[in-house]
Amino acid sequence: PVEEKVRSELEKYPYSLEDLNKMYGNLRTLVSEADSSIAAIHSIQHEKDWFDNPIETTGQFSGVVIDARKEEVLILAPTEAIETADSLEVAFSDSAVLPGAVKQTDSRMGLTMIRVDATSLDDAQFEKIKPVKLGNSYGVRQGDLVISMGSPAGMVHSSSYGFISYIAKNVQMTDGNARVLYADIKSKADAGTFLFNTEGELVGWATDRYEQDVDTGMKTFMSISDYKGALELLSNGIQVPYLGIEGQEVTSEMEKNGMTSGIYMIAAAAESPAYNAGLQPGDILSGINDIKIEGMKNFQAQVEKLHVG
């Protein structure tokens, strides 16, 4: 594996203690800067004990700040943070704690956008809230050093280092394809873990959906670049369009054998719009709203332009 070759070459270099301290000092600085974009999500449940006394239970999750304006700070978090919550509180890295509310959710990808009104903060407090920089995950390469932030160790504001071990391109998923990054790094997807490059940019978020049955120690991350269009919709409170199709492009070879160009359907998710419209495996989706579908990227782009409802 590439990361083993990298380690082997590093081991050959006669690093001094000063070199190591400088290298790890730079990494600590990078982690500290990235951590300023991490927020703690307190998922609060209001319950009663055996004696009918009101009690509160709180779950802890990590989110990443996507945008910061005083009237609205937006935090991307896993849907687990809101599934059983009666109310939400958001604690920023400077310890400011404010009520949160769900702005929009994408259950297909397991993500939710939480909004916070920060007008009660003074300028000094607000300036400590740092929106994350979105990186280009298409530029991530096998062997790259990466950092997981959020809750990789199960606690908010924990972190871990590792290498990209493998990149799976064009992985089939509902309504398109995606790039999945595999890294030998700590990660806890349901608590909120986010992947950063060495520029301090967000390049992915943790998911359990594509982990292998055999425990290899590899953790999986969805590519942020594949999700930027949907991320903009969530930020504006718009529901991400959903058809519920799993399929593959009709190749030129398939066309030579008489198939129509478009997307060959492999499955339709139960109770999805595609399923309810009667689409089934073997059908070919050749267009959306009179626009010809010529490939998977084109299909994904057209789905994102649809309006829910």
Feature map (PLM): residue ranges:
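Active-site-proximal beta-strands of protease catalytic cores
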Residues: 38-40, 73-78, 139-152, 191-213, ...
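Catalytic-histidine neighborhood of serine endopeptidases
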Residues: 68-112, 116-119, 128
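Flexible, gly/ser-rich surface segments that form the specificity/activation loops bordering the active-site cleft
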Residues: 132-176, 211-214, 231-236
